[in-house]
């Protein structure tokens, strides 16, 4: 399967102060077409905005799709592809038996992921000149400015 058969989603989160006002952004690409999404919250964290960007992008897809998500957040990439299995098995507790931070958003992200046929998670280095990741960053900053 080529990437042309998949929806590509580039996501980012931003926060002015952590916690503080924050924003999320997502650039969605499919067969030459693009859609930009962004939003913000007054009192939030960077990690919450990173997760929210992916939730909102996956939710914007009207039907089950094959998706590649690109994120510069190792927290998101590892959380959804590695850590979430243990969290769920332990009733949303960490290995240290502490409540999982942002469990509400992880649960939403898990539900959105499960709506789709296949979701692949790829980490990209942030602020390294990757065109589409830079655009997601700009959208996240627009989200901060919107609150």
Curated annotation (Swiss-Prot):
Monomer. Its cofactor is Mg(2+). One of its GO terms (biological process) is DNA replication, removal of RNA primer. Keywords: Cytoplasm, Endonuclease, Hydrolase, Magnesium, Metal-binding, Nuclease. Endonuclease that specifically degrades the RNA of RNA-DNA hybrids. Mg(2+) 2 binds at residues 12, 137. GO terms for cellular component: cytoplasm. Binds 1 Mg(2+) ion per subunit. May bind a second metal ion at a regulatory site, or after substrate binding. The keyword Iron does not apply. It is found in: Cytoplasm. CDD domains: RNase_HI_prokaryote_like. Belongs to the RNase H family. Its EC number is 3.1.26.4. This is Ribonuclease H. It is an enzyme of class 3 (hydrolase). GO terms for molecular function: magnesium ion binding; nucleic acid binding; RNA-DNA hybrid ribonuclease activity. It catalyses: Endonucleolytic cleavage to 5'-phosphomonoester. InterPro entries: RNase_H, RNaseH-like_sf, RNaseH_domain, RNaseH_sf, RNaseHI. Residues 3-145 form the RNase H type-1 domain.
